[in-house]
Amino acid sequence: MLQFDLLTTDPASHARRGRLTLRHGQVQTPIFMPVGTHGSVKGVLPRSLHEMGAQIILGNTFHLWLRPGLAVLQGFGGLHGFEKWNKPILTDSGGFQVWSLGALRTITEEGVHFASPVNGDKLFLSPEVSMQIQTTLDSDIVMQLDECTPYETRGQRTTERAACQSMQMSLRWAKRSQDEFQRLNNPNALFGIVQGGMYENLRAESLAALAAMDLPGYAIGGVSVGEPKDEMLRIMAHTPHRLPAHKPRYLMGVGTPEDLVEGVAQGVDMFDCVMPTRNARNGTLFTRFGDLKIRNARHKTDPQPLDGSCTCYTCAGPSGVAWDQGGRDGFSRAYLHHLERCGEMLGPMLSTVHNLHYYLNLMREIRQALDAGEFTQLRARLKADRARGV
């Protein structure tokens, strides 16, 4: 089940405001989706995700297949029952994780043979197997199995011929994924994935073939895989707005706050990335005025919160009143610096709450600006603020 309602568009860009209706609820777009690799978003309670406005989260098909395994998940009726999340879930196909195994895997037309990174067992993932796993997970949005085209192969930029061969196999896998998805009578929604590397002609070919399959939604894959930023932005400017206008568009694995704003301007509706959670665990925080390295010595005695305009629990405490509005209930940079220096678990947890809140609030501001016809102004202000620096 999937219904996508296009609510408004921005006349000065390809940005759009929409509403996605799935089996487990509605999602207002544009949206950022926190990543819950092993069935949890690292370092944050599900209650906190609800409080900060998370509407949909991700699960990782590959890792959940390996642990806890399908028998366990089936016993709970799928991923929603297992992790006690009652809103929509999107699961990836497992293709990127298998691709990341490098020498431990062998890709053939039939699928991917690989050694389990957990116990070394020999395993096989095909489009059909991926659909079977994701049907057991009962995720609201299911991704086709694809081959992620790398930016470089053995230190050299992937050739157009190699990218074409990879893209065409992903198209064949898309058809096999669709056939198996339908055979299983899966009531959820299957997305296709546009590939083609950094070659716009291949992206266009992939896009046209997938659009002809009339899938419920489409993703742009194979970006943020080691290419220079200008190359990623070029593909981002080329592909999203060419996808069917009445279907949701998902940019996979991207990215920084600036990337999200630019993606929205190019017509993207959905984003996911591990950056807010991973960076939080490594002491890098996103703020209105740029990124903050909380481990730096200059924060040792700083009484300010991470972001004076932020209303997250970390910055504003239980009152939810931002520092700039007179609130003084949040945690200081000095305290967070201390937690990081001491290796206290609470440090990364509070940082994760802040980063995820920042991303989700950024998307909320974008939706509000689109509703008000003020996206161009918001885009300019966000760019200027972030460039200013903390």
From Swiss-Prot:
* Chain positions covered by the region annotation RNA binding: 253-259, 277-281
Q: Which InterPro entries does the UniProt entry name for this protein?
A: ArchSynthase1/Queuine_TRR, TGT, TGT-like_sf, tRNA_ribo_trans-like
Q: Which cofactor does it need?
A: Zn(2+)
A Gene Ontology biological process noted in the UniProt record is:
tRNA wobble guanine modification
Sequence positions that bind substrate: 92-96, 146, 195, 222
Q: Does the UniProt entry include the keyword Repressor?
A: no
Q: Name one Pfam family in it.
A: TGT
Subunit structure and binding partners? Homodimer. Within each dimer, one monomer is responsible for RNA recognition and catalysis, while the other monomer binds to the replacement base PreQ1.
Q: What does this protein do, in the record's words?
A: Catalyzes the base-exchange of a guanine (G) residue with the queuine precursor 7-aminomethyl-7-deazaguanine (PreQ1) at position 34 (anticodon wobble position) in tRNAs with GU(N) anticodons (tRNA-Asp, -Asn, -His and -Tyr). Catalysis occurs through a double-displacement mechanism. The nucleophile active site attacks the C1' of nucleotide 34 to detach the guanine base from the RNA, forming a covalent enzyme-RNA intermediate. The proton acceptor active site deprotonates the incoming PreQ1, allowing a nucleophilic attack on the C1' of the ribose to form the product.
Q: What is this protein called?
A: Queuine tRNA-ribosyltransferase
